[in-house]
């Protein structure tokens, strides 16, 4: 039986692509383990998957000054020792890393044990963790073809993003019942990430009188962002977040308004949903969402509305453009084959 260790954490985006791959390896009888941090979100997610989870010390890697920068390098070194010992005991055939600060000690620990390391980078440009990990890895899978120019050619394999199978199995009838919607109007699903997006939430609610004339709205507004005055608004359903219902909601969705995090937008792409992307500004991020969104716009998958340009009028105008050019977006979206991502990654895992 072949063995694999997965790693990646710090945010859900560094975990969910692993969840897309793991079921296929289980079918092939791989022995699967996961190494992550003591308190990270990856621990909560993976322990639900009936996979052995091992914790190591970890320190965050920062590009900016913080007093924790004095302590965290020592935590990283402790993490490398923890990972080295754990990997020596597990004796995996390969390590698959999805990035995030906890992955660096695992990658180095694997390299010290002479275990092949495969990385996956979701964004157009590599994050700091993958930049460090790359020198210890044999291959790096990239989600965007354009990412290859930022990485060593001999290590790069373009795959796209692995998407969880359950996301693709939504039921429209269940969504209609859950939401209380009709079949008469198209559905727009709006999401701003797990914490929501204040400007998007406010603008959407201001635009509701106009939007609800033509559309039904599902608004995933983030924790603490519900508006009680709109709870009984016909054609409008708001949630802090949803879990098991999301595939059904996406099945009934005609258009998506979203941030431009890589994992989410590739789920929409695989489901062939035309998108209006409102990326995080450079003031709130390293600019990766802007690059992601612009790539999707160039390929005809999405329209982009920059956060600083978001108003009620601009939002309505972009939604109307999305609706008017729906067929053109659909034609472009059909060219992408999302299933190839998982197949390609599993092939290289098996060959490592």
UniProtKB/Swiss-Prot annotation:
Annotated signal sequence range: none
Its annotated pathway?
Answer: Cell wall biogenesis; peptidoglycan biosynthesis
**Tell me, which GO biological process terms does this entry list?**
carbohydrate metabolic process; cell division; cell wall organization; lipid glycosylation; peptidoglycan biosynthetic process; regulation of cell shape
> One Pfam family this chain carries?
Glyco_tran_28_C
Give GO MF terms, alphabetically. Answer: UDP-N-acetyl-D-glucosamine:N-acetylmuramoyl-L-alanyl-D-glutamyl-meso-2,6-diaminopimelyl-D-alanyl-D-alanine-diphosphoundecaprenol 4-beta-N-acetylglucosaminlytransferase activity; undecaprenyldiphospho-muramoylpentapeptide beta-N-acetylglucosaminyltransferase activity
In short, the EC number is: 2.4.1.227
GO annotation, cellular component aspect:
plasma membrane
Which pairs of positions does the record mark as disulfide bonds? Answer: none
Reactions listed under catalytic activity: di-trans,octa-cis-undecaprenyl diphospho-N-acetyl-alpha-D-muramoyl-L-alanyl-D-glutamyl-meso-2,6-diaminopimeloyl-D-alanyl-D-alanine + UDP-N-acetyl-alpha-D-glucosamine = di-trans,octa-cis-undecaprenyl diphospho-[N-acetyl-alpha-D-glucosaminyl-(1->4)]-N-acetyl-alpha-D-muramoyl-L-alanyl-D-glutamyl-meso-2,6-diaminopimeloyl-D-alanyl-D-alanine + UDP + H(+)
Spell out the Gene3D superfamilies in the cross-references. Answer: Glycogen Phosphorylase B
User: Where is the protein found, in the record's own terms?
Assistant: Cell membrane
Cited NCBIfam families:
murG, PRK12446.1
Instruction: Give the matching HAMAP family.
Output: MurG
Protein's job: Cell wall formation. Catalyzes the transfer of a GlcNAc subunit on undecaprenyl-pyrophosphoryl-MurNAc-pentapeptide (lipid intermediate I) to form undecaprenyl-pyrophosphoryl-MurNAc-(pentapeptide)GlcNAc (lipid intermediate II).
Q: Which family does it belong to?
A: Belongs to the glycosyltransferase 28 family. MurG subfamily.
Name of the molecule in the record: UDP-N-acetylglucosamine--N-acetylmuramyl-(pentapeptide) pyrophosphoryl-undecaprenol N-acetylglucosamine transferase 2
Q: Which organism is it from?
A: Bacillus thuringiensis subsp. konkukian (strain 97-27)
